Regions:
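Conserved alpha/beta-domain cores
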Residues: 1-137, 143-145, 157
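Gly/Pro- and small hydrophobic-enriched strand-loop and loop-to-helix capping segments
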Residues: 147-160
């Protein structure tokens, strides 16, 4: 969360990852302290990033596995459009895909689907070889299906 992470990033050195749904009005702040964004799902947000970012960012495009935008993410066609725009940036780097398992879907099924999507995506975007998937309750299944980054903040810091 931007409101929680921004102050911490100024006092603790490291590589800071932003995870969560992006709001246009928060992008200037997010890009001031984060090094990696895990949840980009709109071209308009990337256009803002290009204007306001003070340093280069690594970016994961968030794909929706069930077509719903309620938990963030875009359909794979929209994600490919977004990735095409990012890959031509002189400052920012497309590093992979991110997804959240849909509610009511078994983690194994969701992450198997994501793994297949990611493999097909890398045909067009071979440098996007990272996969951000899995949270505190399902990260083991995500790792089995190729996750390189897991999001387990609530296991470490507690629920927010």
């Amino acid at each position: 969360r931007d409101s929680e992470d921004a102050p911490k990033a100024t006092s603790v050195a490291g590589t800071w990852h932003f995870q969560g749904q992006i709001q246009s009005n928060k992008l200037k702040s997010i890009t001031s302290w984060s090094n990696v964004i895990h949840s980009l799902d709109e071209i308009k947000h990337f256009e803002i990033i290009e204007k306001v970012a003070v340093h280069p960012l690594e970016i994961f495009c968030q794909v929706s596995l069930d077509g719903s935008t309620g938990r963030g993410g875009a359909g794979i066609d929209k994600v490919k459009e977004l990735a095409s725009v990012i890959q031509y940036s002189s400052r920012h780097r497309l590093v992979g895909l991110m997804a959240v398992a849909p509610l009511g879907v078994q983690a194994a099924q969701a992450f198997s689907q994501l793994s297949a999507i990611h493999k097909a995506f890398m045909v067009d975007f071979p440098k996007a070889n990272k996969l951000s998937a899995g949270m505190s309750g399902d990260f083991e299944e995500a790792i089995i299906h190729g996750a390189t980054h897991i999001r387990i903040g609530s296991s470490i810091l507690g629920s927010r």
